Design a protein with these regions (language model features):
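Iron-sulfur cluster-binding electron-transfer modules in prokaryotic oxidoreductases
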Residues: 1-161
């Protein structure tokens, strides 16, 4: 947005945390030492999935959706199982765009539906890269007493170091 809004082109590359971690893994600058022994599923956030694809259509889908999956697959002792609705077809968690503030009951219902999909994979945990998703999915776990853990990708990376 900066080049369009201000006529400025930054002298640095802007990337997501998942992109950075994926890049560090490919460059062999990041290594893990602790196995996590955890079965997970990944929730694609609207902000880093559909929205990025809409605003930056020149990006290939694999560059948007694969970095967090590559990181999860590299974590020792982590098994990743996809939910049926994933990548650009992912079900929204209900938190984005101010929905959680404006419609809190709907937001929890939506997140609970997503948790049902996660449970159907047999996963012990649902992982995302969006703080809004993490918060709303955690709130839905508490409200519905769903036996799932909710993590941000960086939390698992830190545990495996």
């Amino acid at each position: 947005d900066y080049p369009k809004m201000f006529g400025l082109k930054p002298e640095f590359e802007i990337m997501t945390t998942a992109d950075l971690l994926d890049s560090l893994l490919r460059e062999e600058k990041l290594r893990f030492s602790r196995p996590l022994n955890l079965h997970v599923t990944y929730h694609d956030p609207c902000h880093s999935g559909r929205h990025v694809s809409i605003y930056l259509p020149e990006l290939e889908k694999e560059k948007v959706f694969e970095p967090p999956r590559n990181v999860l697959k590299a974590l020792p002792g982590v098994k990743l199982t996809e939910m049926p609705r994933n990548r650009e077809l992912s079900w929204c968690c209900g938190a984005g765009g101010g929905a959680k503030s404006a419609y809190p009951d709907w937001a929890i219902w939506t997140a609970t539906e997503r948790l049902k999909e996660a449970q159907e994979t047999g996963a012990q945990a649902i992982v995302s890269t969006c703080p809004f998703c993490r918060r709303n999915l955690s709130d839905a776990v508490e409200a519905s007493k769903t036996p799932l853990q909710v993590y941000d990708l960086t939390e698992l990376v830190a545990q495996a170091l």
